[in-house]
Amino acid sequence: MEPAKMAPIKNAPRDALVMAQILKDMGITEYEPRVINQMLEFAFRYVTTILDDAKIYSSHAKKPTVDADDVRLAIQCRADQSFTSPPPRDFLLDIARQKNQTPLPLIKPYAGPRLPPDRYCLTAPNYRLKSLVKKGPNQGRLVPRLSAVSSRPTTPPVAPPQAVSGPNKAATPVSVTSQRFAVQIPPSQSTPAKPAPAATAVQNVLINPSMIGPKNILITTSMVSSQNTATDSNPLKRKHDDDDDNDTM
């Protein structure tokens, strides 16, 4: 450092000159000018703390003024806290010997950094986050939401029943109940005018309720059995066969 920085200023305060002289007497010749200010702040803080402690001790002993014994007691108590010397070497060796007798924890057998368990390291968090959101009774459950459109398949619209007029048999009106629909279909119009008394076959058709709704629909169809149709067509066939035989003769 330059000598101009180490030399105290002549017009400096008296406390600064005294601190510079103390540093010179201790053999400290190289320092920055700000060191004197730091030393003055430390000295002021230390002296005021010692005097405050001495005043407390004097009032506790019920003395009218602070004497030298109170100051010595304050310095002795403050020295144990502020100015501590390192422990002796023998004491440190004894503590190190006792500490080294404790075996180290086993290392986990896995790939990666060979570290002791997490409780002996500072790598794992030692806290747990608490959620502020309170879970309700129904939270976390999946509640199915069904719509009227997706719950049942679409069905084509049913045309209103109409009365069909036949040459032989009049169509019976359609009877509609609350839950069942009875529909009777008359025999086909292609049959000849000559009615043939034959037993009618009844066929019941039950539609799956899941396709239409909660109501069941029963459709009753009255139809002429296939045997009656066969008996009606057989005379015509026989007549044609007889005509063919006459022509050949």
Swiss-Prot record:
| Keywords linked to the UniProt accession | Acetylation, Nucleus, Phosphoprotein, Transcription, Transcription regulation
Chain positions with Phosphothreonine modification: 172
- Any Pfam family hit: TFIID-31kDa
Q: Which residues carry this modification: N-acetylmethionine?
A: 1
Origin superkingdom:
Eukaryota
Query: Which residues does this entry mark as bearing Phosphoserine?
Result: 147, 175
What protein family is recorded? Belongs to the TAF9 family.
Q: What does this protein do?
A: Essential for cell viability. TAF9 and TAF9B are involved in transcriptional activation as well as repression of distinct but overlapping sets of genes. May have a role in gene regulation associated with apoptosis. TAFs are components of the transcription factor IID (TFIID) complex, the TBP-free TAFII complex (TFTC), the PCAF histone acetylase complex and the STAGA transcription coactivator-HAT complex. TFIID or TFTC are essential for the regulation of RNA polymerase II-mediated transcription.
What is the protein name for this chain? Transcription initiation factor TFIID subunit 9B
Q: Which organism is it from?
A: Mus musculus (Mouse)
